[in-house]
Amino acid sequence: MPDTAPARLPLVGLPPAAELGRLLAKRSAPIKAVLLDQSLFAGVGNWIADEALFQAGISPHRPARDLSPAEVGRIRRALHAIVALAVKHDADSSRFPKSWLFHQRWEYRGDLQTSRGESIVRETIGGRTAAWVPTRQR
């Protein structure tokens, strides 16, 4: 049965972590694909989903239903913080923190690495390209 709740806006409409956890517990798809579902998370695009999972330390492959309450809380906080900062800086990516995965995920030559030298893997998850760091995201 489809969820009839309205889509959640990351800056103003995310439910409390416990409610978000109940919503995610109904989803068997990888968390990356769930975050890109616009009927659930309006406005969360590919780079925001990758960045939130990177900052939360969560593998994009993890089934949404398997996330712990602490992990759901980390994803929720990351989504809110990323969107709040992007809005604050009028989406001027040159003003985003240099530690963000965002700055390296767009490179298409050579071995991709984070600002800390960690390898970035690029693969398709849920029909979309995902950039993630296996040594940091579990």
Over which residues does each language-model region extend?
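Phosphate/anion-contacting hairpin/loop surfaces
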Residues: M1-Q55, I75, G126, V133-P134
